[in-house]
């Protein structure tokens, strides 16, 4: 799925117009301080383009966290983002305490030329996602008439619509698909992300290696299935490797992650790999722990020895890392989605860190390396490798759905050209 037939910001006339722009400012916070501003920085080129080309105003809307339709300004306000944005843009940002309604509409109706406005969290209204919880935590659904009113109010805030929220492109939420304006364009971040993935999936450099980690096989079935039609090699690591090893090698896995649902299709996936000539690399040794805890006792195990009862594998061992390094060394293009160990804890981070080092090395020799958002992007931030790989996606779920071969609703909703 590419943007080739969709309107993009560089082709949009913004002069004298009010631009309403969906961005992804869902940034990690600690005590109301932003801990990683990657997503805010990523939206700056689109915002600057509008201002440099004479837009009357740029009204920015985003979600933050999961307030589930309940206003929680103490916990999930976008106000700290306004200050961060001001320093990145070098100009004032007007923060509004809501995202819809008469007061917001008035503030956005006729602002001074070149005004930047940031709306409060879209998800303080249940109409953004269409469902949520009430103040007591009971599940609620938004009424269709109220969803229509919410979307109509958002549509009054601009003359043209730009969507630069790649991280939310896989969600059919009101701000993504429900703004009703004659021109709806993809922003520069959206364009960059889709171009990278389109090229990677439609005309890859070969050998093409996918590195797939993470916990559950069932969550990654479609991903593995779709990628088996595209790649030459695949590393299957992380927690989901144990399901494969138990089914294929009858390995004793102790209390390691095991996915009953996923286990049923392991053999089908392996026979598809064989049919397509895809070389699969699984881990052969492990760093184990006596409980799921940062300070657990640690041990070592191999596929042959098995993992003793009551113990679990939380990282791959050095032999596995060597095998992974060989696969990376053969590749001319790599897509990596999911860590191969519990990288958040020092004792179980070595496998993912050594793999990251190899991917950085591969990049420096000209291999195209794409990091598919989410936890793997967090690894790049943690080890400072964001500018040492070809592309770090800003969207975990969105990049996953692209790699699964799905159409993204947020892209689908843009104007055709």
Swiss-Prot record:
Q: What is its main location?
A: cytoplasm
Pfam families, per database record: PGK (PF00162)
Q: Which EC class is the enzyme in?
A: transferase
Q: Where found?
A: Cytoplasm, Cytosol; Mitochondrion matrix
Post-translational modification N6-acetyllysine, affected residues? 11, 48, 75, 86, 91, 97, 131, 146, 199, 267, 291, 361
Q: Which residues bind ADP?
A: 214, 238, 343
Which SUPFAM superfamilies does the protein's record reference? Answer: Phosphoglycerate kinase
Record-linked InterPro entries? Phosphoglycerate_kinase, Phosphoglycerate_kinase_CS, Phosphoglycerate_kinase_N, Phosphoglycerate_kinase_sf
| Residues recorded as bearing N6-succinyllysine in the entry | 6, 48, 191
What positions does the entry give for AMP binding?
Answer: 215-216, 220, 239, 313, 344
Mark the residues carrying the PTM N6-(2-hydroxyisobutyryl)lysine: 97, 216, 220, 323
What post-translational events are described? Answer: Phosphorylated at Ser-203 by MAPK1/ERK2 under hypoxic conditions, which promotes its mitochondrial targeting.
Q: Which residues take part in binding CDP? A: 214, 219, 238, 338, 340, 343
How would you summarize where this protein is expressed among tissues?
Testis, lung, brain, skeletal muscle, liver, intestine, and kidney (at protein level).
Instruction: Relate the protein's function as given in its record.
Output: Catalyzes one of the two ATP producing reactions in the glycolytic pathway via the reversible conversion of 1,3-diphosphoglycerate to 3-phosphoglycerate. Both L- and D- forms of purine and pyrimidine nucleotides can be used as substrates, but the activity is much lower on pyrimidines. In addition to its role as a glycolytic enzyme, it seems that PGK-1 acts as a polymerase alpha cofactor protein (primer recognition protein).
The record's annotation in PANTHER family points to: PHOSPHOGLYCERATE KINASE, PHOSPHOGLYCERATE KINASE 1
UniProt protein name? Phosphoglycerate kinase 1
Q: Which organism is it from?
A: Mus musculus
């Amino acid at each position: 799925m590419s943007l080739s037939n969709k309107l993009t910001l560089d082709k949009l006339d913004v002069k004298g117009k009010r631009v309403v722009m969906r961005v992804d400012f869902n940034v990690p916070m600690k005590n109301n301080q932003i801990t990683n501003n990657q997503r805010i920085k990523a939206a700056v080129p689109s915002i600057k383009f509008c201002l440099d080309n004479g837009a009357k105003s740029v009204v920015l809307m985003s979600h933050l966290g999961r307030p589930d339709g309940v206003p929680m300004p103490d916990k999930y306000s976008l106000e700290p983002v306004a200050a961060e944005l001001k320093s990145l843009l070098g100009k004032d940002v007007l923060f509004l305490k809501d995202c819809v309604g008469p007061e917001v509409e008035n503030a956005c109706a006729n602002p001074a030329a070149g005004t930047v406005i940031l709306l409060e969290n879209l998800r303080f209204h249940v109409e953004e996602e269409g469902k949520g919880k009430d103040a007591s935590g009971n599940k609620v659904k938004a009424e269709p008439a109220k969803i229509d009113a919410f979307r109509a109010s958002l549509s009054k805030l601009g003359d043209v619509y730009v969507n630069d929220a790649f991280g939310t492109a896989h969600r059919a939420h009101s701000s993504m698909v429900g703004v009703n304006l004659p021109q709806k364009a993809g922003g520069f971040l959206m364009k960059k992300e889709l171009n990278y993935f389109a090229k990677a999936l439609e005309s890859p450099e070969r050998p093409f290696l996918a590195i797939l980690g993470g916990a559950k096989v069932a969550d990654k079935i479609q991903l593995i299935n779709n990628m088996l039609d595209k790649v030459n090699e695949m590393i299957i690591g992380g927690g989901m490797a144990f399901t494969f090893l138990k089914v294929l090698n009858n390995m004793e896995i102790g209390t390691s992650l095991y996915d009953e649902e996923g286990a049923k299709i392991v053999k089908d996936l392996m026979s598809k790999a064989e049919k397509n000539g895809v070389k699969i690399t699984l881990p052969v040794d492990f760093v184990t722990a006596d409980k799921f805890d940062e300070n657990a006792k640690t041990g070592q195990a191999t596929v042959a020895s098995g993992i003793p009862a009551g113990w679990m594998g939380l990282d791959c061992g050095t032999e596995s890392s060597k095998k992974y390094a060989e696969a990376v060394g053969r590749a001319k293009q790599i897509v990596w989605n999911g860590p191969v160990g519990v990288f958040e804890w020092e004792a179980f981070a070595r496998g993912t860190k050594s793999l990251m080092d190899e991917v950085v090395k591969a990049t420096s020799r000209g291999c195209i390396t794409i990091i598919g958002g989410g936890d793997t992007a967090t690894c790049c931030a943690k080890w400072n490798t964001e500018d040492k790989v070809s592309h770090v996606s800003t969207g975990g779920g969105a990049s996953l759905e692209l790699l699964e071969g799905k159409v993204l609703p947020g892209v689908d909703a843009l104007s055709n050209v």
